[in-house]
Amino acid sequence: MAKKGKNYLEAAKQVDATKAYTVEEAIDLVKKVDFAKFDASLEVAYRLNVDPKQADQQIRGAVVLPNGTGKTQRVIVFAQGEQAKQAEAAGADVVGAEDLVEKIQGGWLDFDVAVATPPMMAQVGRLGRVLGPKGLMPNPKTGTVTMDVTKAVNDIKAGQVAYRVDKAGIVHAPIGKVSFDAAKLVENFKAMQDVIIKARPASAKGQYITSLSVSSTFGPGVKVDVASF
């Protein structure tokens, strides 16, 4: 494990590691102990009682946070014809088809989210080895494979967050910036919480959310009481 820096250790002293805080208390504490010299993201980490190896327990989706993420997302869209025009009108940063596929094959990756229409997926599929490991591959579950490119671009620009359970059964997701008003962060948290709960697989047994913490980008995690979830 990497050695923690002095600032981290000082921040960690202010967090009671034996206590599970309310969401409101946890967010206030994360804001208080954040030591970054930039506007850090505030992130949640859910540990879920699921087996990601099972197809029906691979939790994945997207949610539009009511107060956004505080980050401007660069969106590209793979589309042709009318959908390409709609994507441009909606404010997509780059729109293309085969030319865009070739551009990415050439090493260009200056974007945060990729959207594709279903007819384009045969070509976009060639980028799987490039986009897949980076979490940039369009996927129907996150609303990024769709004919309604206008809605997709609007949602992403408005603060949509994609989430996915990892191999350890943990979902990491940003819910805003530390500079956000605490009440807005709580609203964003509740929006994320709702979709995580609704995504519970029917086959999941026992307590679904086994632990939950919030933290800033480099700050210590603050445990949240999950007894009511």
UniProtKB/Swiss-Prot annotation:
Highest taxon of the lineage: Bacteria
Protein name: Large ribosomal subunit protein uL1
Pfam families: Ribosomal_L1
One GO BP: regulation of translation
Keyword NAD found: no
Keywords: Repressor, Ribonucleoprotein, Ribosomal protein, RNA-binding, rRNA-binding, Translation regulation, tRNA-binding
Cellular-component GO terms for this entry: large ribosomal subunit
Gene giving rise to this polypeptide: rplA
InterPro entries: Ribosom_uL1_bac-type, Ribosomal_uL1, Ribosomal_uL1-like, Ribosomal_uL1/biogenesis, Ribosomal_uL1_3-a/b-sand, Ribosomal_uL1_CS
UniProt entry tagged with the keyword Ion transport: no
Subunit note: Part of the 50S ribosomal subunit.
GO MF entries: rRNA binding; structural constituent of ribosome; tRNA binding
Function: Binds directly to 23S rRNA. The L1 stalk is quite mobile in the ribosome, and is involved in E site tRNA release.
Gene3D superfamilies in the cross-refs: 3.30.190.20, 3.40.50.790
Family the UniProt entry places it in: Belongs to the universal ribosomal protein uL1 family.
